[in-house]
Each structure stands twice: as C-alpha cells, then as structure tokens.
C-alpha cells in the first residue's frame, strides 16, 4: 500500500493583537455615517454653550434689575405681600395709564397724603379704588431712583409681571412710546428733556416727528379712569 501523505502543519496562531482585532465587534456600515458627523455636532454643541446670548437693552432690561427694590413688598414675581400684587393684570386695573403709576411711585404714600389726594389710581377700578395707605406705605422712590430707573421698573411691572400685551390695541402705543428698546419718551426722560417732576405738558415726538400725547407727571393728583 502507498504511504499516506503527511498531514499539513497547523497554521501559526495569530499574534495577540490580530486575534483581538478579529474578535472585536465590528461597527455596522450604517453607523459609520452617523459617527462621521459626531465631530461636527460636537463642535456645534460646544459653540452653542460658549456663545454669549444677545443682551437685552432699553427699559425692560433695566427694569428687571431695579425691581429688586420692590420685590420685598410686592413679591419676586409680583404676587403681592406687604404691598399690592402686580401679577395677572392687577397693576393695570389700578393704573390704566402709565403716567398715574409713575406719579405714585415718584411721590409715594406720604407725598399723596401731604397733598390730600386719597385715590391715586383708577377711581372706577373694579372692586373699588385703591386709596393712599390702604395696604402698607409706599416709599417715595423719586428721591431714591433716577427718573429713567423709575420708568424702567414700571415698564417691567406692567409688561412682564402684570402681563400687558405690547401688541394689543390697548397697549401697543404705550409700549412703543415708553417701554420699547427705542422708546422716545424713555429716551427723553433719560436725556433730561422730559422731567417727571414737571407739571408742564411734555413735548416728545416719535421717530416720524409726530408729537406723542403724554400726560404730565408733576405733583400728586387723583388718578384717571380707563379710556
């Protein structure tokens, strides 16, 4: 009988790093496209975290900082406390006109008492008019804040805390003239061409040069009804 051919020699074992590579789980082809985008998404994510947001300007930006002087009495969110609430339209019910609110903040309870003025806001307010000293004593911030700070914080109280709609027919003009970033009345107060302490009718024009109807602030007087 013919001799049997010699058995083939067994293959040499793979080096450990080759064996490990063969045993490693392979990444599916479909996942490769996703993984290839990870550096791009990572860059965009980090950029979003590090880019500084655009800072707000104008009365509302200043007003939120000035409101720290008011929060202890009226609540951090305007919910009330020692002083009346501002939230949910409350301050708008009391002061349909921003000028009346500014005047009361300037003179406070003592100023109105000395002038003999009892009703500082809307005399026809639903639920009854608010009277001077009816709930705590309002400080006279005309001696503590600048005039443009007073306007700014009142813009914050009306449009942020109380929820006045700056796009509504009722408040669009007031917001544009007093509380927008380019508000001409606020700018006039800031530059000193309109003083909150004057009893004279202020002369302020809009961007088109048309006069803006503004009630003088001046000395304490009874508040005005809506309309």
What are these regions (language model features)?
Residues 1-15:
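N-terminal intrinsically disordered, acidic low-complexity segments at the extreme N-terminus
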Residues 75-146:
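Gly/Gly-Pro-rich "capping" loops immediately C-terminal to redox-active cysteine motifs
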